[in-house]
A protein has these predicted regions:
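Flexible "cap/lid" loop of the alpha/beta hydrolase fold
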Residues: 84, 92-120
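Short beta-strand/loop motif that positions the catalytic acidic residue
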Residues: 175, 181-183
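Short alpha-helix in the alpha/beta-hydrolase fold that links the catalytic acid
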Residues: 177, 191-199
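Conserved alpha/beta-hydrolase catalytic His-Asp/Glu region
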Residues: 109, 121-174
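Active-site loop/oxyanion-hole signature of alpha/beta-hydrolase fold enzymes
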Residues: 29-70
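Catalytic histidine-centered segment of alpha/beta-hydrolase-like enzymes
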Residues: 214-223
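Acidic catalytic loop of the alpha/beta-hydrolase fold
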Residues: 186-190
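Conserved HGGG/HGGXW glycine-rich cap/lid loop of the alpha/beta-hydrolase fold
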Residues: 1-37
Length: 234
């Protein structure tokens, strides 16, 4: 299985959240190109299929004709782009709180802009936490490891603000891979009320799941982790 991490993070950190997959799958985890980590420091456009073409090249370089894939947030957007640009290389797919299906209008994230600017100016932790709160919904979802990862990325790398754009229906329908789309009810970036209906419309072989009462940053329950494993095993 190939795993794609979220924006402005690293795959090493992402594996903490994907540890439930390791018992049943051989995991390949790459640092997304242009993001923090060890991949090339080359920024690809999130507005076309460059990320999908890159991921297709990664799958080919690993020696697979096709592979199961899991992606969250920005990484799910990369996976969605891959399903369009290299549809036959994706065997089964899980898109978790995904970008690239039905992104919310940019105005929805404006509440994070002022705290982010204040953090850049003052470097006071309270401002970074206020910036993250719309995504977390409650402070308890801003765990120490999530906070420290975000802080290090912001302090030491050039933050990517543009999310993968919505894929086109005609391109997504080229992919026949069984796909599970999981979207959060209170996600300010990619709300379930937009993501799930469009996923059902544009993805040929899709199953959708609502993460009730949760925002963009939240934890999977044990039964949800098991559902993902069973889906990927087919």
């Amino acid at each position: 299985m190939l795993v794609f991490h979220g924006g402005n993070a690293t795959t090493a950190y992402n594996l903490l959240a994907c540890d439930f997959l390791m018992k049943d799958f051989h995991i390949y985890a790459v640092d997304s190109i242009g993001h923090p980590g060890k991949s090339a420091e080359v920024s690809l456009s999130p507005n076309n299929y460059d990320y999908g073409k890159w991921a297709g090249e990664v799958i080919e370089a690993l020696g697979y004709d096709s592979i199961c894939c899991f992606g969250g947030s920005f990484g799910a957007g990369i996976l969605a782009k891959t399903m369009c640009a290299a549809p036959h290389k994706v065997k089964r797919a899980v898109l978790y709180v995904p970008s690239g299906i039905k992104n919310a209008p940019a105005i929805n994230s404006m509440s994070m802009m002022f705290p982010m600017i204040m953090y850049w100016i003052t470097h006071q932790d309270k401002w970074l936490k206020k910036c993250m709160l719309p995504m977390a919904v409650t402070e308890k979802n801003i765990t120490e490891d999530i906070y420290e990862t975000a802080k290090l990325s912001i302090n030491h790398s050039k933050v990517k603000t543009g999310m993968p754009s919505n894929v086109k229906e005609k391109d997504m329908r080229k992919c026949e891979a069984p796909t599970l789309v999981m979207a959060a009810e209170k996600d300010c970036l990619f709300p379930a009320k937009g993501v799930l209906p469009r996923a059902e419309r544009i993805i040929k072989n899709v199953k959708t799941y609502l993460l009730e009462g949760r925002g963009h940053m939240s934890s999977l329950r044990d039964e949800e982790k098991q559902m993902i494993v069973e889906f990927l095993k087919g």
